[in-house]
Amino acid sequence: TWDSRYPNIISKVTRTIALAPSSGGTPLADAVIAGNSFEQSLGWLLGYGSDAVKQQQVSWMESYNAQWLYGTPNRPSLPSRFETVVGSDVESAVWDSDSYCGGYQNQVGLEVTQNWLDSCSDGFLNCSSQSLAGVVWFTDKSRTQGGEPLSHQQSRRNCFGLPNMLKNRI
């Protein structure tokens, strides 16, 4: 790191748990930045032309991982344990109460965006991107209450026992 404040903090961190991390970028960023005219127009309309979105393009993340970031294949390891929780699917059935955790409208949106992604995705990130850095602690259905999948939205909410799992892990 180039910032003199960080080594002291880094030396004290023993474990990081990342929820659906974007270690490998997302094809959704590729689509809204450099996709067909419909995808780019949609990205513009929704305000997804920012530098943050550009940096999540798969090719940009490949470059970061190859040159700068630690913990990915063929790179130095991280100074402390980096564990990930991977979300593998999205459910948005109107009759299923689980679909409302984190907001039903968000689930529907992630069902749509899942069409640009692999069959294993949380609606925003492919499982391969989420599991690229560090060690996978678990993939959603293997530990969540009821074996429920965690969408990208749900992995940031109080859904399916996730907060208790995190609390018990720490």
Residue positions per predicted region:
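Helical cap/lid subdomain of alpha/beta-hydrolase-fold lipid enzymes
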Residues: 3-170
